[in-house]
From Swiss-Prot:
Key words of the record: Glycoprotein, Secreted, Signal
Location of this chain's protein in the cell: Secreted
Domain of life, per lineage: Eukaryota
UniProt record similarity statement: Belongs to the PLAC1 family.
Record's protein name: Oocyte-secreted protein 3
Glycosylated residue positions: N64, N130, N148, N151, N165, N178
GO cellular component terms attached to this protein's record: extracellular region
First and last residue of the signal peptide: 1-22
InterPro entries in the cross-refs: PLAC1_fam
Organism: Homo sapiens
Predominant location: secreted
Length: 193
């Protein structure tokens, strides 16, 4: 009976996240930093996620609570963040873990961020959509457009969230589709940071 209740709660959580069309998670990175901002209403307006119920990667806690949500700001070498380096592209992979303590429900939202550049410097990167440069810190809230998370993936499903922005050029949207990685799925859209 206990397993049935957990399964039912897991299905409800998955349904809420799948149907949610709000901007719930923003992801950013440089060649040395990785950050995520998750809204407390990630699970829907009726299910508030508390800061101690979310973690990044291998259990890294929220680093800051702001009006926009819970911030995770870590060096790209921590929290089990995975990195793949290609000729002019570095791809970072991680996951946002949700553990709804009072309901016994856990979930995982895969995250991905791409850094373009000819070298792996550790000081700065450029955000593609407005060419704003920054030094090892997430950009100010007014300096970039947040990326939408419109299809969340939970419980190891083979679908990654859509990080889509109208400024993403068509030639870059399918870049990772030719690369093998367990988080890449044929219908994935990739945001350019």
């Amino acid at each position: 009976m206990k397993d049935f209740v957990r399964l039912q709660s897991s299905f409800l959580l998955c349904t809420i996240l799948t149907l949610s069309e709000q901007e719930s998670v923003s992801v950013g990175c440089t060649s040395s930093m990785f950050w995520v901002v998750a809204e407390p209403t990630l699970l829907g307006q009726d299910h508030i996620l508390h800061s101690d119920e979310a973690s990044l990667g291998t259990g890294c806690p929220v680093t800051n609570v702001t009006a926009k949500g819970y911030e995770f700001n870590y060096p790209a070498t921590q929290c089990g963040i995975q990195k793949e380096v290609f000729s002019y592209v570095t791809v970072f992979y991680s996951a946002l873990h949700c553990n709804i303590m009072h309901k016994g429900v856990t979930g995982k939202i895969p995250l991905m961020c791409i850094v373009y550049g000819s070298s792996l410097d550790t000081t700065s990167s450029t955000i593609h959509n407005n060419l704003t440069e920054f030094q090892n810190d997430p950009p100010a809230t007014n300096s970039y457009s947040p990326w939408n998370l419109t299809n969340a993936s939970l419980f190891g499903l083979t679908r990654i969230p859509y990080f889509q922005n109208s400024s993403v050029e068509a030639s870059h949207q399918s870049l990772l589709l030719n690369m093998s990685h367990p988080l890449v799925h044929e219908s994935a859209n990739v945001a350019i940071f």
